[in-house]
From Swiss-Prot:
Source organism of this protein record: Dictyostelium discoideum
Top enzyme class: transferase
Protein name: Serine/threonine-protein kinase pakG
Residue ranges of coiled coil: 12-53, 621-668
Cofactor(s) annotated in UniProt: Mg(2+)
Family membership noted in the UniProt record: Belongs to the protein kinase superfamily. STE Ser/Thr protein kinase family. STE20 subfamily.
Length: 1179
């Protein structure tokens, strides 16, 4: 019974145990099903993530995983163990339990990550790792690779798989930028873009897992090799980079930070684009433009700096700058601070290679295509892939880049071995780069095995700072509308920040003064560049003491205001000035709104607040002082940099203003010069010069209204009332001038004639002296020249005065009609001019400019043969024989005609009378007068007559009219006074051309009646004897004498006539002067019916014409022919226009300009013609 009872009890216990075991098994099955379901879900997630990462190879991975799972299930043997458990005893149950535990251990050992159920390595749909909370236990941080636009990049190793990858640590505060970068990395699946493995949060930072490129960046390769790349290497790198850019641009993504530091290369020589921290995903795919100012200054496109809308063509510009960087190891403008470089990029021409001749044309063209300021002209990425510089390279990337990669790897390994902290374990630090090197990190979690990461990063920063001038701004700048990272925000400047924007740099090496690691400082980009250029922050006490006086002076005064005062910067700097510096040491640059005057007051107040807070926090006092000193030092550097920028801008502005001012001054000066250029003299004035200069005569006009009237060069005659000044021709050197004084105003209204004739050395019986220079001229002192006495002026008749006045009155009236009549155009070139031919040694000084101008003109012989014939009445007169050759000078020396009548008071005029009446009428014919007398008159109320070195004669009263001599059977002699002055009248040619025309009516003498035009009477036969009122003998001057057998002048001048006329009365020895015929036995030159006859002086170089001396005079025809004497100066012929002319005879110049002589002689080789009467008055 006891045994049964025992057996029953045992059986009942075993049943209970079985029930319990069954219950446990059921529970275990439920758990297993749940785990399987969870595992399937996780496996699907893994498969999907692997499909995204791996791509087309995900199908094979799925099959392999399925096979591995089946094998694991077979090894577990869960179903058989369960069946055995149902029919086994307690021992069997214990065996099952043991086996079950062993199976669980086998599961954990055999199924590797990420396929086990322990969730060792897992990522979700957002590529977030969910397997473990502490990524430090999964990854081993090896070294720091570099810093990006928002964080630091490390080289890491996955502990379970030894897979090498790159981890980018970014502060979680920058959530917007992180989301942008992650979203872009998720979408980018290209061979030339770094792969994205996922992300996970570690402390206050976010870790982004990316593909690792063993050869690092192109920038690292340039620094390691210390040499630039070859054109083949550049071609391969650019080709692959353009493929990556094309993929991004197709996805409507702008990288915005293309540079050598962001182009990576792996061991297989595959180029990959990295660092999408500032990349932009354009929402508007149609427009495809952005406007945010981001990027690295030296690589920024001009449209980004100008804050204009831009598209993906900005990456093409950056790629062109990168090509220059690879070819020359540095980008353009790398030696300049970033702010100055950003000012120069939009304003300077596009950058090129510094030595383009050292590189091929294809590379220069590629850079030129990329770096075009107009974005529309830049080619796209797909177009650049067809550029000859990229197409001509046939080599594979491995062949070209593999040697470079191996060299870089060797040098990097060697550099690691030589580093001092290579084998020493560094102190525990966090793998972030948020604190400066000398700042302690309180309350920071410690990575177990990842120690010394920050020290390595700091050492790397030091090496980077030493290799390049960090003012080249290799860091990426971001212009933001607001800071967003300031915790206090007490000194927010309002809405003006958005308009101007603040250029900031995400510098992970600085934290705020309170020492809290979660508050990230944002400082201006150029301050960060200056900070890097100056090395580490000043930590020594001596340097702090040196900076303290600077800091105090900056706090007491406005730094920007001092800059404005020193450089006189425009007031608009307030709109661009510094707004404030908040308590987080964030320097905001932009418009400060209404707080412009309080910009730096806020800065000083904030510094004071910081100092108060530091006094309360003893642990952080040193840190705040260091930061304050750092800021003050940086502000001082900013001041210097702003001064340099301002000076450069002011230099450019001043140079531009100077060039504009020079252009304006040149324009004004040219206008003044053009306005002051003397107008070209008209034809009448030139004829005046030609006539006077060829004859080498001296004109002595009287200035009637002004003593300082300008010379001919300064005022050319433009009206009939203007008077021209005649300059003289002198031999070299010129003699001392004879200066005659001006008349007093009381005598200016009286017309005065000054007659000067050539005389022999014998004294004249006249007691009247020559005019003496008594009153001074305005320009020079007076001086006289001793000359022989000549007949007095008192013996001269008033007809001479009247004729001279009339000649002056009619001058420019004829000048105004020069271009009216073609038949009279040649005759109009001869002005009436009364000139003197004194000795060349005593002639007054005259300017040489007109002499050179008019004496060098070639003759115009065409006027000779084209002159119109005289009236028909005189055309039938036989020509006068002449044996003298044609003189080009005399043919040139012609003055403008004065169309005045030669008959007055119903009687024929003598040579002097015809001269007196020659200018009373404009359109009547006049006589040609050639005398040795200089006659100058002044009109009443007319334009003043001025001549350089003018001689001023005495005024004479008007004499009575000359009576007619009716007793002469052959040829009526001129009146006695005219006889007396006949030889002196020979110099009286061309008076009117000497002085510009005056008023016709106002200048006429009261005693001079109007000249009536009438036909002159026929001439009687020539007279045999000539008497003169003066006893001075007449010496033969030249062999040019008239033939006694030719009493008439030929109707027109021809070459034959001139040659015949050149033989008239050579070497006349008669010593008496006759006013009736004027020959006096002297050689006579005939001039045919032109308005005026100039005195012709034969120069010393001209040959003397030989002939016979004839003692009896010739009776000349009224139509006398001009005989031209040889001269050294060119001349022009003259045309007849009047029926009468006055013959001229050569006379010699004398020194006395005021006396009258009745004889003509030859002195030396100078010969002057003397005028003779051409007809006798008819009874």
């Amino acid at each position: 019974m006891e045994e049964k009872i025992k057996s029953n009890l045992i059986h009942s216990k075993t049943n209970e145990d079985i029930e319990l075991i069954k219950q446990k098994l059921k529970e275990d099955r439920e758990l297993l099903e749940k785990e399987r379901a969870q595992f399937e879900e996780e496996r699907k997630i893994i498969f999907e993530s692997l499909n995204k990462v791996v791509g087309s190879g995900s199908a094979n991975i799925t099959k392999n995983i399925a096979k591995a799972l089946k094998k694991a299930e077979k090894k577990n043997g869960v179903g058989s163990n369960l069946n055995l458990a149902n029919s086994s005893s307690g021992s069997n149950i214990s065996v099952y339990n043991n086996n079950n535990n062993n199976n669980n251990n086998n599961n954990s050992n055999n199924i590797g990550t990420p396929f086990n159920v322990q969730h060792k390595v897992h990522v979700d749909f957002d590529y977030k790792w969910s397997g473990c909370q502490d990524l430090e236990q999964v990854f081993l941080i090896d070294c720091i690779l570099g810093t990006g636009s928002y964080g630091t990049v490390y080289k890491a190793i996955h502990k379970d798989t030894n897979f090498v990858l790159a981890i980018k640590s970014i502060p979680i505060k920058e959530s917007e930028e992180i989301e942008k970068e992650i979203s872009i990395l998720k979408k980018c699946k290209s061979q030339n873009i770094v792969s994205y493995f996922g992300s996970g949060q570690q402390g206050d930072n976010l870790w982004i897992l990316m593909e690792y490129c063993s050869a690092n960046s192109i920038r690292d390769m340039l620094e390691l090799t210390e040499k630039s790349l070859t054109e083949k290497q550049i071609s391969v790198i650019l080709q692959q980079a353009l493929k990556g850019l094309h993929y991004l641009h197709q996805s409507n993504i702008i990288h915005r930070d293309i540079k050598a530091a962001n182009i990576l290369i792996n061991e297989d020589a595959i180029v990959k684009l990295a660092d999408f921290g500032v990349s932009s995903q354009l929402e508007d795919s149609l427009r495809g433009e952005a406007s945010q100012l981001v990027g690295t200054p030296l690589w920024m496109a001009p449209e980004i700096i100008k804050r204009q809308n831009y598209n993906n063509k900005c990456d093409i510009w950056s790629l062109g700058i990168t090509a220059i960087e690879m070819a020359e190891s540095f980008p353009p403008l790398y030696t300049m601070p970033p702010t100055r470089a950003m000012l120069m990029i939009p304003n300077k021409p596009p950058p090129t290679l510094s030595k383009p001749h050292h590189f091929s044309k294809e590379l220069n063209d590629f850079i030129g295509q990329c770096c075009q300021k107009d974005p529309e002209k830049r080619p796209s990425a797909i177009e650049l892939l067809t550029h000859p510089f990229l197409v001509q390279n046939i080599s594979t990337p491995q062949e070209v880049l593999k040697p470079l990669i191996d060299e870089c790897l060797k040098k990097s390994i060697k550099k690691k071995k030589q580093s001092p902290n290579n084998d020493q374990p560094p102190p525990p630090q966090t793998p972030n780069k948020l604190s400066p090197p000398d700042t302690p990190l309180p309350n920071v979690p410690v990575l177990g095995k990842n120690q010394g990461l920050l020290n390595k990063s700091n050492g790397m920063k030091k090496s980077h700072g030493s290799s390049l001038d960090e003012a080249e701004s290799m860091n990426t700048f971001i212009l933001k509308s607001t800071i967003g990272s300031s915790s206090n925000g007490s000194n927010d400047t309002g809405g003006d920040d958005f308009d101007c924007g603040t250029m900031i740099l995400k510098d992970d090496t600085c934290i705020n003064g309170s020492g809290n690691a979660d508050k990230i400082s944002t400082i201006p980009a150029f301050i960060a560049a200056l900070n890097k250029s100056n090395g580490k922050v000043i930590t020594q006490n001596q340097q702090q003491q040196q900076q303290q006086p600077i800091a105090s002076s900056l706090q007491q005064s406005n730094p920007i205001a001092s800059i404005v005062n020193e450089n006189q910067y425009p007031n608009t700097i307030e709109k661009r000035g510094l707004s404030s510096i908040n308590s987080n040491n964030s320097l905001l640059i932009g418009n400060s709104g209404n707080n412009k005057s309080q910009n730096f007051n806020n800065f000083n107040n904030n510094n004071n607040n910081n100092n108060n807070n530091n006094n309360n926090n003893n642990n952080n006092n040193n840190n705040n002082n260091n930061n304050n000193n750092n800021n003050e030092f940086l502000i001082n550097q900013i001041k210097k940099e702003l001064i340099l920028d301002f000076n450069e801008n002011m230099k450019q502005y001043i140079n531009q203003q100077l060039t504009n001012l020079k252009e304006e001054m040149l324009k004004e000066i040219s206008k003044i010069v053009i306005a002051n250029i003397p107008q070209a003299p008209i034809k009448t004035s030139q004829s005046v010069f030609n006539q006077q200069l060829s004859a080498a005569a001296i004109i002595h006009p009287i200035s009637s209204s002004s003593s300082s009237s300008s010379s001919f060069l300064n005022s050319s005659p433009s009206s009939s009332n203007s008077s021209a000044t005649i300059f003289k021709k002198f031999p070299n050197p010129p003699p001392t001038p004879v200066l005659i004084n001006k008349l007093p105003p009381s005598q200016q209204s009286t017309p005065v004639t000054t007659t000067t004739t050539t005389s022999s050395p014998s004294p004249s019986p006249s007691p009247s002296p020559s005019p003496s220079p008594s009153s001074p001229l305005p320009s020079s002192s007076t001086s006289t020249v001793n000359t022989p006495n000549k007949p007095p002026i008192n013996y001269r008749k008033s007809k001479e005065l009247d004729s001279t006045i009339n000649i002056f009155n009619g001058l420019n009236n004829n000048n105004t009609n020069n271009n009216n009549n073609n038949n009279n155009s040649n005759n109009n070139n001869n002005n009436n001019n009364v000139i003197q031919s004194p000795k060349l040694n005593n002639r007054p000084l005259s300017p040489t400019t007109p002499t050179k101008q008019f004496n060098n003109r070639p003759p115009s012989p065409s006027k000779f043969n084209n002159r119109p014939p005289s009236p028909s009445k005189f055309n039938n007169r036989p020509p006068s024989p002449s044996n003298r050759p044609l003189s080009p000078k005399n043919s040139y020396n012609s003055l403008e005609k004065s169309n005045n009548g030669s008959i007055s008071n119903n009687r024929p005029l003598s040579p002097k009378n015809s001269l007196e009446k020659s200018t009373t009428q404009n359109n009547t014919s006049s006589e040609d007068i050639s005398t040795t007398t200089v006659t100058v008159t002044s009109e009443q109320g007319g334009t003043p007559i001025t001549t350089p070195m003018a001689f001023l004669p005495r005024p004479k009263p008007s004499p009575p009219p000359i009576p007619m001599n009716k007793s002469s059977p052959k040829r009526a002699p001129s009146p006695s006074s005219n006889r007396r002055l006949s030889s002196s009248f020979t110099a009286q040619s061309s008076t009117a051309s000497t002085i510009a025309a005056l008023g016709k009516q106002s200048s006429m003498s009261p005693n001079s009646p109007l000249i009536k035009e009438r036909v002159p009477p026929p001439l009687p036969p020539p007279r045999t004897t000539i008497t003169s009122s003066t006893n001075s003998p007449i010496k033969p001057l030249s062999p040019l004498n008239k033939s006694p057998n030719s009493p008439y002048v030929p109707p027109r001048i021809t070459t034959s006539n001139i040659s015949n006329n050149s033989n008239i009365n050579n070497n006349n020895n008669n010593n008496s002067n006759s006013s009736s015929n004027g020959s006096g036995g002297t050689p006579i030159t005939l001039k045919r019916a032109s308005t005026t006859i100039s005195p012709i002086m034969i120069s010393s170089n001209s040959p003397k014409v030989m002939g016979s001396n004839v003692n009896k005079p010739l009776a000349l025809s009224r139509n006398s022919t001009e005989i031209n004497l040889p001269s050294s100066s060119p001349s022009t012929p003259q045309k007849p226009n009047t029926p009468s002319s006055i013959p001229t005879t050569p006379t010699t110049p004398t020194t006395n300009g005021g006396s009258v002589s009745s004889k003509s002689s030859t002195i030396g080789r100078k010969t002057v013609l003397q005028v003779k009467s051409i007809f006798s008055p008819k009874k």
